[in-house]
């Protein structure tokens, strides 16, 4: 491609709305342009990168025995109603009606569609196993789109679905997909790690996320400092800290005027936050749920939602709901006598002695409270783990890092096949539900994650296999006929070799061209300058290194070396 013919618009200034490096650089390098909140148009340069990532995904999925398919993005409500997810998916689903007043949605995911296809096409165990996938645009009405394509309302995703006759078959399919994902992210130049995860609205049993460590990631990921254990904080089990046993004391009511926060309570009672139990009140659809945690702990909303079961939306209760449940102002809630539909008590609180709680009375607290004697509830793990707790597998300390999810694999089991009546005839002539798996990769999010891991102060540094162009050929002075002619000859020869080459034949200063080449992240640069009269050009790698002066034949060999180093063939 010649840049004089190319739709490209690099920006020197950082767009005001961009917060993270990938968002800034995707806009500055001319990869995309914003159309509305969370909605982007992909420019030619950006589309080439997306297609390169798609091709990697496609190759690895095909190598793993999956077949590509393309389903409709517009889905009738009936399929989602069959699975029970029409209501369960919540406000993130784009819903619409056609001219006949029939309900449809724009697919945020396609479990129902693929289950419907397979139940109509596959009748016998002899037709199994089956693994189908598609690469398609998805739609989710995010409450707060942010970070460019990291959390957008329209995004490109690879979603795949496996169908097996038994659990053994699902386990095999799941492992094949895990290996394929490892290959995909390695080829994309991403340092991604599989971590244990919650299944969320997708459902099912086993689940793993592929996480990329990132300071701007939206997830907290728990890692063991000694073994390979890793999990999303939503999934990671906490280790209760057992308090030292005490003799049970009588409950006392204490006046605490305007003392609401844990910090203020600890000062007032001259105690550690570990001697305080806070009561958080949530609205879970039409239920009011109270959760009791140790004062210094954070609630884990995923664990709470899983304990409640089938929750569409979980949020902190309104001030009015709190007053109705407690009879008091906000800040004085406690588990004794509270009027809620469900009372969840963290396992740590159940092992505390003589602790302090809200009295469900404004400006009042109770001390010397004990679980079992003074109140009871559903005991479980309802909090986030913290740095330094014990690994659930080896017992050593854990640490926590921020991460971005780029892929997710699930063992769905029979969740969808049973709810939608998707069955096959087994070896004994009996109808059985398909055992399903689900496998997703965020293609556009993967592109952004590559940029997050591969950039410097000058712009993007694309790994060779995903780069929009492999080599940028720059005539230092396009008005110099020899430089312009030789640059075009080199450009044409590279293309014959199978190299994606970009000829910057614009009537711009060499410095401008160098800056654009670096900003766009082109892995190799060949500059045709004053030394071309001696048959020499300059070669430079985007990811560092000095400028090399080479003959034209040597520069072709140098390009081949970089392809070999990246395990790519020409």
UniProtKB/Swiss-Prot annotation:
The keyword Lipoprotein does not apply. It catalyses: tRNA(Pro) + L-proline + ATP = L-prolyl-tRNA(Pro) + AMP + diphosphate. The keyword Nucleus does not apply. It is an enzyme of class 6 (ligase). It is found in: Cytoplasm. Its main location: cytoplasm. GO terms for biological process: prolyl-tRNA aminoacylation. Its EC number is 6.1.1.15. Gene3D superfamilies: Anticodon-binding domain (3.40.50.800), Bira Bifunctional Protein, Domain 2 (3.30.930.10). Catalyzes the attachment of proline to tRNA(Pro) in a two-step reaction: proline is first activated by ATP to form Pro-AMP and then transferred to the acceptor end of tRNA(Pro). As ProRS can inadvertently accommodate and process non-cognate amino acids such as alanine and cysteine, to avoid such errors it has two additional distinct editing activities against alanine. One activity is designated as 'pretransfer' editing and involves the tRNA(Pro)-independent hydrolysis of activated Ala-AMP. HAMAP family: Pro_tRNA_synth_type1. Homodimer. Consists of three domains: the N-terminal catalytic domain, the editing domain and the C-terminal anticodon-binding domain. This is Proline--tRNA ligase. It comes from Clostridium perfringens (strain ATCC 13124 / DSM 756 / JCM 1290 / NCIMB 6125 / NCTC 8237 / Type A). The gene is proS.
């Amino acid at each position: 491609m010649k840049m004089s013919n190319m739709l490209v618009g690099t920006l020197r200034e950082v767009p005001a709305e961009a917060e993270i490096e990938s968002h800034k650089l995707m806009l500055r390098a001319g990869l995309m342009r914003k159309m509305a909140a969370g909605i982007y148009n992909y420019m030619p340069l950006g589309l080439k990168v997306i297609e390169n990532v798609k091709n990697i995904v496609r190759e690895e999925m095909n190598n793993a025995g999956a077949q590509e398919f393309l389903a409709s993005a517009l889905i009738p409500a009936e399929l989602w109603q069959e699975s029970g997810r029409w209501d369960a998916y919540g406000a993130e689903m784009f819903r619409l009606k056609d001219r006949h007043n029939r309900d449809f949605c724009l697919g945020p995911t396609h479990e129902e569609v693929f289950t419907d296809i397979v139940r109509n096409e596959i009748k016998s165990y002899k037709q199994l196993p089956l693994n189908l996938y598609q690469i398609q645009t998805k739609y989710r009405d995010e409450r707060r789109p942010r970070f460019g394509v990291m959390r957008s309302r329209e995004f490109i995703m690879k979603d795949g679905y496996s169908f097996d006759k038994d659990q053994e078959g699902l386990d095999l399919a799941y492992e094949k997909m895990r290996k394929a994902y490892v290959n995909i992210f390695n080829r994309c130049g991403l340092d991604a790690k599989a971590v244990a995860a919650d299944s969320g609205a997708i459902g099912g049993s086993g689940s793993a996320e592929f996480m990329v460590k990132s300071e701007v990631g939206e997830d907290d990921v728990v890692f063991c400092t000694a073994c390979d254990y890793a999990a999303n904080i939503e999934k990671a089990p906490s280790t209760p800290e057992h308090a030292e046993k005490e003799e049970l004391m009588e409950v006392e009511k204490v006046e605490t005027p305007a003392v609401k926060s844990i910090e203020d309570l600890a000062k007032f009672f001259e105690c550690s936050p570990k001697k305080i139990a806070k009561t958080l009140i949530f609205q879970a659809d039409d239920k009011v749920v109270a959760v009791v945690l140790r004062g210094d702990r954070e609630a884990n909303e995923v664990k709470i939602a899983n304990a409640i079961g089938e929750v569409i939306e979980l949020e902190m209760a309104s001030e009015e709901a709190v007053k109705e449940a407690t009879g008091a102002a906000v800040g004085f809630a406690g588990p004794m006598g509270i009027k809620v539909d469900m009372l969840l008590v963290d396992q740590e609180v159940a092992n505390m002695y003589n602790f302090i709680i809200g009295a469900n009375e404004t400006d009042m607290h109770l001390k010397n409270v004990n679980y079992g004697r003074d109140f009871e509830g559903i005991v479980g793990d309802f909090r986030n783990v913290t740095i330094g707790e014990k690994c659930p597998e080896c017992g050593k300390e854990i640490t926590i890092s921020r991460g971005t999810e780029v892929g997710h694999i699930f063992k769905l089991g029979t969740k969808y096949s049973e709810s939608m009546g998707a069955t096959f005839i087994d070896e004994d002539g009996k109808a059985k539900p398909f055992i399903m798996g689900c496998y997703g990769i965020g293609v556009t999010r993967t592109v952004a994650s590559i940029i997050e891991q591969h950039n410097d102060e000058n712009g993007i540094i694309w790994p060779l296999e995903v780069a929009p162009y492999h080599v940028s050929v720059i005539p230092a002075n396009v008005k110099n006929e020899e430089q312009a002619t030789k640059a075009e000859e080199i450009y044409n020869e590279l293309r014959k070799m199978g190299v994606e080459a970009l000829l910057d034949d614009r009537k711009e200063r060499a410095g401008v061209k160098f800056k654009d080449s670096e900003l766009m992240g082109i892995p190799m640069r060949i500059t045709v300058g004053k030394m071309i009269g001696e048959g020499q050009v300059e070669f430079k790698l985007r990811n560092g290194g000095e400028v090399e002066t080479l003959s034209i034949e040597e520069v072709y060999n140098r390009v081949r070396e970089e392809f070999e180093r990246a395990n790519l063939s020409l």
